[in-house]
């Protein structure tokens, strides 16, 4: 996505970025086009959700219990962030390297950075996490179904960290519950069926403009397990083939990289949209 911006330096202030309104509008239209594409039904999406009905039958009970335990641990994220909180300071350092002539010390400074820099850092974060997920998938693919039990919760953790990295890259604070709810919604959108995608996109349309939107989004997360099982089912055939010992390495790496790429793209689009809308509001 091509980004347009100009820089105006102001001595003693971090408010040195302006972006033309018409350029912001152009980028917003590209994101809205992407949103419409997400609401199309693809044959592979339908097909990919079938095998977990078989996988549930083939998976031993002790592995089901292990997955359940790990998912319960992940459930604390929405309330406290738990062990999945990201390193805000490390991401701020990336901004400082990109903008060496400016003082970038906080999220407030990040919020005023050029969108082009935000995009670049967010893409880098997503790419690094996708590579880590591929290694995770290849490792767990060695042992087939017995190591698959640990893979999905591990990738879920990487997904949460990826979305938090992207949130920070666009100047939002994942320590706030409002942002963790938004992150869960991004995760849901990346793995939902067409009905779910339409509902979530409609739900998030005015996330910052209307406080009722946030409250509605939070109340509609009926249970973390529902989010997790929808996420799990979206892996489909790729994870099904990962059950094959050794050969599962290839399928595991591919499935995980694909999943993290989709999640990173979703996070970038939705967080960038919020930042653009805020900047457009500032130009009114």
Describe the predicted segments one by one.
Residues 1-136, 165-284:
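Terminal, membrane-proximal amphipathic helices
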Residues 136-149:
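Transmembrane alpha-helix interface/packing and boundary motifs in multi-pass membrane proteins
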Residues 150-153, 254:
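Short, conserved micro-motifs enriched in small and acidic residues
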Residues 152-156, 173-174:
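Active-site metal-coordination segments of metallo-dependent hydrolases
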Residues 155-159, 166:
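Conserved mixed alpha/beta catalytic, RNA-binding, or beta-rich assembly cores of soluble enzyme
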Residues 158-161, 258:
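A general alpha-helical scaffold signature found inside nucleotide-binding enzyme cores
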């Amino acid at each position: 996505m091509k980004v347009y911006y100009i820089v105006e330096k102001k001595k003693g202030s971090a408010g040195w970025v302006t972006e033309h309104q018409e350029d912001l509008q152009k980028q917003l239209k590209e994101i809205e086009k992407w949103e419409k594409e997400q609401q199309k039904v693809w044959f592979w999406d339908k097909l990919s959700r079938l095998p977990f009905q078989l996988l549930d039958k083939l998976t031993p009970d002790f592995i089901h219990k292990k997955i359940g335990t790990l998912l319960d641990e992940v459930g604390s994220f929405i309330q406290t962030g738990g062990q999945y909180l990201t390193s805000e300071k490390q991401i701020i350092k990336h901004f400082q390297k990109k903008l060496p002539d400016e003082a970038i010390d906080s999220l407030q400074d990040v919020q005023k950075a050029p969108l082009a820099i935000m995009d670049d850092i967010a893409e880098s974060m997503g790419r690094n996490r996708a590579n880590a997920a591929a290694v995770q998938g290849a490792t767990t693919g060695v042992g087939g179904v017995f190591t698959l039990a640990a893979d999905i919760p591990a990738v879920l953790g990487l997904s949460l960290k990826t979305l938090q990295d992207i949130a920070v890259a666009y100047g939002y604070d994942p320590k706030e519950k409002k942002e963790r709810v938004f992150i869960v919604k991004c995760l849901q959108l990346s793995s939902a069926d067409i009905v779910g995608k339409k509902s979530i996109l409609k739900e998030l349309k005015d996330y910052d403009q209307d406080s009722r939107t946030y409250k509605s989004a939070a109340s509609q997360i009926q249970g973390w397990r529902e989010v997790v099982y929808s996420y799990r089912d979206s892996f489909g055939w790729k994870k099904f083939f990962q059950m094959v010992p050794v050969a599962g390495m290839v399928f595991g790496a591919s499935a995980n990289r694909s999943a993290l790429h989709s999640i990173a793209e979703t996070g970038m689009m939705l967080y960038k949209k919020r930042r653009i809308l805020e900047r457009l509001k500032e130009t009114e």
